[in-house]
Amino acid sequence: EKDKIYGILFDGAWLWEEYLNTILKPCGFRHPENKSQKGGLKMFQKDADNETISKNSRKLYPDFWKDDFILDAKYKHLNNGVGREDLYQVVSYMYCTTAKNGAYVYPYEKVEDPVSYQLSGYKGIIHVAPLYIPQTEMIFEDFIAGINGSEDRLRNFLQSKDN
């Protein structure tokens, strides 16, 4: 009995996406369900082309999107930069949807401003936006106030770029 270990496993990346959905949905972002193949975007203009070129009915499933914005939820720090595959994925989604903005949102333990980078070509912009998660609050109400402020900062930033 003393050597037993009890625990729970969960998909932190999935939970992070669902949490972000509560913040982003009121801003008009859609959250496709790639596992159930709902809400995907077309890669090609003609449906027949999806089958002809790939034999796999290519659909795009960004974590979040709206008219001129692609957003990727990352449950990892991006302070050392965005990984190559992550970058190519968002740029591809932006290109296929002609979105001017792409963003990565990730949890962070400090308050930091988002950083923006202009792409070559059609001049889209990639934003790297840390979402501050309060770490030191000892009272639940203080944590709630801190996280609400973080959520508001993220919403305000994204809405300021969506013009």
Locate predicted features.
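Catalytic core segments in nucleotide and nucleic-acid processing enzymes
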Residues: 3-163
